[in-house]
């Protein structure tokens, strides 16, 4: 199989394929991908939720593109697309997916907001990890995952860096079991074809995002 065949297997695995429905809030997870903010705005305009929390400070990969922080730039983009500022809450301190949820929860509690359901909006290949992390850290929250509908080829074209996307895919796959083993996320079934594709991509050198195990 080609590297793109293997990447497609990982890409399909990470997406939860949840049916969209109305929820109390949206949580837009910060990253290098402004498409998260744009998709969140699309769903808001469809009436899927009345309140958006954009969560994220900076990672080393986002400082240049979002110098004032991921949440700030996401909020500005959503406003440009017609979301009123009164519907946007910014959580500007999270530096990882776990903090996206713990700090968002704490912020909402301080504001007297107690959601029972949420739409988690992320990069397409972050869906499963975000879902597992939220299940572990905020188990009473009823969540669905959503991302801008894109093929892998279209997503790579939108980011403009194939190797970066493929390295992120491999790294996020490994994090499914590493974070579960560390207690940061719930365990997720990893099918054999996903493990085989992951190992083949590692063998092809896509290891820049691999964690020590």
Residue ranges and their predicted role:
Residues 2-169:
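A structural signal for short, hydrophobic/glycine-enriched beta-strand patches
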Residues 1-5, 210-213:
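Short, low-complexity, intrinsically disordered N-terminal peptides in bacterial proteins
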Residues 159-213:
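A conserved mid-domain beta-alpha-beta active-site/ligand-binding segment of alpha/beta enzyme cores
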């Amino acid at each position: 199989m080609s590297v793109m065949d293997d990447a497609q297997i990982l890409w399909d695995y990470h997406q939860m394929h949840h049916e969209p429905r109305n929820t109390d809030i949206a949580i837009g997870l910060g990253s290098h991908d402004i498409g998260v903010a744009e998709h969140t705005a699309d769903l808001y305009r469809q009436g899927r939720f009345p309140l958006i929390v954009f969560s994220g400070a900076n990672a080393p990969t986002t400082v240049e593109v979002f110098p004032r922080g991921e949440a700030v730039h996401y909020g500005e983009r959503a406003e440009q697309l017609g979301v009123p500022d009164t519907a946007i809450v910014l959580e500007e301190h999270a530096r990882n997916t776990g903090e996206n949820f713990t700090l968002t929860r704490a912020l909402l509690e301080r504001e007297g907001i107690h959601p029972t359901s949420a739409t988690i909006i992320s990069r397409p290949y972050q869906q499963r990890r975000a879902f597992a992390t939220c299940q572990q850290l905020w188990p009473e929250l009823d969540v669905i995952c959503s991302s801008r509908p894109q093929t892998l080829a279209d997503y790579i074209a939108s980011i403009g860096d194939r190797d970066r996307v493929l390295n992120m895919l491999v790294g996020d796959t490994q994090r499914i079991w590493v974070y579960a083993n560390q207690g940061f996320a719930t365990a997720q079934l990893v099918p054999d074809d996903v493990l085989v594709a992951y190992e083949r991509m590692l063998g092809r050198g896509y290891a820049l995002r691999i964690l020590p195990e």
